[in-house]
UniProtKB/Swiss-Prot annotation:
An example Gene Ontology CC term for this record: cytoplasm
Organism: Dictyostelium discoideum
Binding-site residues, ATP: 80-88, 103
Similarity field: Belongs to the protein kinase superfamily. CMGC Ser/Thr protein kinase family. MAP kinase subfamily.
Enzyme Commission number: 2.7.11.1
Segments forming domain Protein kinase: 74-398
GO biological process, one term: intracellular signal transduction
Name of the protein described by the UniProt record: Probable serine/threonine-protein kinase kinase DDB_G0280643
GO MF entries: ATP binding; protein serine kinase activity; protein serine/threonine kinase activity
Catalytic residues of the enzyme: 231
Length: 442
């Protein structure tokens, strides 16, 4: 195994990916230096060939090691932390000739069983949805041994503890230990996140219609497998490729309808923001249905039309107030069905103390009547009153692009036994499961 140190780069230097697409070799010598046993810097082998592209090569940066196949050319300017147990970076895959995102996760990530469960759930649903037109799955999953130990800066550890509200005693400061086996997850680098397109006003009315249509078709595909997505976040879960196609990613919040118990829906439902969560998911033991995703799709449609966020909610009460201000108070029967206990009391008290008109009409003053009708029938308190995905697709809004014959449902069956066993798996069992079920051959 060769070991290299990533040299400091000027952010404007993009030469790391200078190469001829039809070449069998890539020169990486100008970006990295090798260190021999005496600490002397030596030039690395400058040729990547089909015969050596899967050899392990280890790079050091800021005290951490990244061990990848030689065919992965790392862009050192893109290395970022993703929690205390992982880093993420962009690389060029010489074999596929594509820029990719690699996420490196320490096996220690699985010491936190909740994190481990979410990783396994993501892999299970990726396998289920693989091949779907609007699905982006990992291109490969591999593991490599650490070449050295690494302890992150104290500020990084403290920030992680504060942001996660975990017990500090549960955190290990030694995140990477020599000879630990780290997992690497490779995915195609998307052209844009959906949020990029929304917030930068890059879309005309035809673009909005097409993207919203593709969001609905992606949901219809997942729903055909009896699964709801639950986390329609345009920043982290939905991307747009170079051909302007919607791609769904991150399936760790997916919920198996008619099979998953309701307690599981709430037990491990962790999203980055409340802004896309349907009101019935905030509290309660309702029967969750595809209508949960219809609410999220309605929020996305609103944001596509407005060119900005619809809600900015970071806790349950704040989110319920934001919904209340937009569409008004729920009827008594709706409120009791959607929220329970303390939150129902909070909502009724908030309604009693506040008297103002909903902002819906003013918010969407620039939209046409067809768009307004869709929004009203997606963004409603009671999930039983929302349009289904099929009803939305039959709207005149899509009359020029909807092709009823062009839908291919998910034809795979979920391995329910593995799915149910997730909650009972211990850290070593989770890593063994990845080895057995998901790891690419070395």
């Amino acid at each position: 195994m060769d070991i290299y140190y990533i040299l400091n780069h000027d952010n404007s230097d993009n030469n790391i990916f200078d190469f001829e697409n039809n070449s069998d070799t890539i020169d990486i010598g100008k970006n990295y230096k090798k260190c021999n046993g005496q600490g002397q810097m030596l030039p690395p082998p400058t040729l990547i060939t089909p015969s050596n592209q899967n050899d392990t090569i280890t790079y050091y940066t800021d005290g951490r090691s990244i061990s990848v196949p030689r065919k992965m050319l790392i862009d050192p300017n893109t290395i970022v932390d993703c929690g205390t147990n992982g880093i993420m970076f962009i690389a060029f895959n010489f074999e596929t000739q594509k820029r990719v995102i690699l996420k490196k996760l320490s096996k220690r990530m699985f010491d936190n069983e909740l994190n481990g469960h979410r990783i396994i759930r993501n892999l299970i649903f990726q396998n289920l949805f693989q091949g779907g037109k609007h699905i982006s799955t990992y291109q490969s999953i591999f593991k490599r041994k650490c070449s050295d130990s690494y302890q992150p800066p104290l500020t990084s550890i403290l920030n992680s503890i504060i942001s996660s509200n975990d017990n500090p005693q549960q955190h290990s400061t030694l995140i990477q230990q020599k000879d630990d086996e780290d997992f690497y997850f490779e995915s195609i680098q998307p052209q844009y996140s959906l949020l990029n397109l929304i917030s930068n006003n890059m879309l005309d009315q035809d673009d909005i219609c097409q993207l919203f249509y593709e969001i609905l078709m992606g949901l219809k595909f997942m729903h055909s497998a009896g699964v709801i997505h639950r986390d329609l976040d345009p920043e982290n879960s939905i991307f747009v490729d170079e051909n302007f196609n919607i791609k769904f990613t991150e399936f760790n919040n997916c919920f198996l309808l008619d099979t998953d118990p309701t307690f599981l829906f709430n037990k491990e439902y962790i999203t980055n923001t409340y802004s896309y969560r349907a009101p019935e998911t905030i509290w309660g033991d309702s029967l969750y249905t595809e209508a949960t995703d219809v609410w999220g799709a309605g929020v996305l449609f609103a944001e596509l039309l407005l060119g900005k966020r619809l809600f900015r909610s970071f806790n349950s009460k704040e989110h319920l107030k934001s919904i209340y201000k937009l569409i008004g108070a729920p009827k008594a029967s709706e409120g009791a069905y959607v929220v329970k206990g303390e939150l129902l009391f909070f909502l009724m008290e908030y309604n009693r103390k506040n008297s103002f008109q909903p902002t819906f009409n003013n918010t969407f003053i620039g939209c046409n009547q067809i768009q307004i009708d869709l929004l009203k029938n997606m963004l409603c308190w009671d999930p039983r009153d929302r349009y289904s995905v099929n009803e939305i697709l039959e709207s005149p809004y899509f009359e020029n692009i909807h092709d009823r014959t062009n839908f291919i449902p998910c034809d795979k069956n979920l391995n329910v036994n593995i799915h149910f066993d997730i909650l009972n798996l211990k850290p070593n069992q989770m890593t063994n499961l990845i080895d057995q079920e998901f790891l690419n051959p070395s």
